[in-house]
Curated annotation (Swiss-Prot):
Family from the record: Belongs to the universal ribosomal protein uL3 family.
Protein name (Swiss-Prot/TrEMBL): Large ribosomal subunit protein uL3
The encoding gene: rplC
Taxonomic placement: Bacteria, Bacillati, Bacillota, Bacilli, Lactobacillales
InterPro entries: Ribosomal_uL3, Ribosomal_uL3_bac/org-type, Ribosomal_uL3_CS, Transl_B-barrel_sf
Pfam families found in the cross-reference section: Ribosomal_L3 (PF00297)
Protein's organism: Streptococcus thermophilus (strain ATCC BAA-491 / LMD-9)
GO terms classed as biological process: translation
An example Gene Ontology CC term for this record: cytosolic large ribosomal subunit
GO molecular function annotations of the record: rRNA binding; structural constituent of ribosome
SUPFAM superfamilies: Translation proteins (SSF50447)
Length: 208
C-alpha cells in the first residue's frame, strides 16, 4: 500500500549519527493533511484519496471550495492533491508524519527553482567554442540541423526559460521523523525553493 503526505520545504541542515557520520538532510514540515474526498470507481471512474494541506483564510476561497472542505469539517486548503493505492481512510481523517519512519525509501516531488532565460551551455550542458581572439564561435547553440528540411525541428536544444518544472527524485531515504514538530528529515537535497510544496510518497522503484 502506498503512503503519501504533502509538506513544505524548510531548508537544509546537517546531522551526525552516533558513529560520527555526517549526513546532509532536507527539512520538510508536514502539518497534518486532511482527507477531503475518497474517490471510487463507481462514482469517479478511478480510486484515489484527495488530501488538503496548508490552511488559508476563508475570504480567499469561493463558495464551491468552502462547500467541498465543509464535508471534511476543516478550513479551506491552499494545496489539494490526490494519492492512489491508499486504503483505510475516511473523509475528515488526518494524515500525519508518523506514517513514515526512519529508513523508509520515498519519492519526493517538487517544482524546481526558476532560473529565467538561459543559454544552451547552462540550460542543456553544451560545450562552448574556443575563447581565443580569432574565434567567432563562443557560446552559440551550434548547428540547427541539415539543409533539406528548410526548418528547425521541434525539441532542438536552444536557449529559453529554464527551471520551474515538476521534478521527482526517486529512492531518497528518510533519516528521521519528529512527530511532535511535524517534521521529516530526508537524506540529500530535494527540488524546489524554501516554502515550496513537496510531495512525499512511497518509492515506486525500490532498491534491489
Amino acid at each position: 500500500m502506498t503512503k503519501g503526505i504533502l509538506g513544505k520545504k524548510v531548508g537544509m541542515t546537517q546531522i551526525f549519527t552516533e558513529a560520527g557520520e555526517f549526513i546532509p538532510v532536507t527539512v520538510i514540515e508536514a502539518t497534518p493533511n486532511v482527507v477531503l474526498q475518497v474517490k471510487t470507481v463507481e462514482t469517479d471512474g478511478y480510486e484515489a484519496v484527495q488530501v488538503g494541506f496548508d490552511d488559508k483564510r476563508e475570504v480567499l476561497s469561493n463558495k464551491p471550495a468552502k462547500g467541498h472542505v465543509a464535508k471534511a469539517n476543516t478550513a479551506p486548503k491552499r494545496f489539494i492533491r490526490e494519492f492512489k493505492n491508499i486504503e483505510g481512510l475516511e473523509v475528515g481523517s488526518e494524515i500525519t508524519v508518523d506514517i513514515f519512519e526512519a529508513g523508509d525509501i520515498v519519492d519526493v516531488t517538487g517544482t524546481s527553482k526558476g532560473k529565467g532565460f538561459q543559454g544552451v551551455i547552462k540550460r542543456h550542458g553544451q560545450s562552448r567554442g574556443p575563447m581565443a581572439h580569432g574565434s567567432r564561435y563562443h557560446r552559440r547553440p551550434g548547428s540547427m540541423g541539415p539543409v533539406a528540411p528548410n526548418r528547425v525541428f521541434k525539441n532542438k536544444h536552444l536557449a529559453g526559460r529554464m527551471g520551474g518544472n515538476r521534478v521527482t527524485i526517486q529512492n531518497l531515504e528518510i533519516v528521521q521523523v519528529i512527530p511532535e514538530k511535524n517534521v521529516i528529515l530526508i537524506k540529500g537535497n530535494v527540488p524546489g525553493a524554501k516554502k515550496s510544496l513537496i510531495t512525499i510518497k512511497s518509492a515506486v522503484k525500490t532498491a534491489k
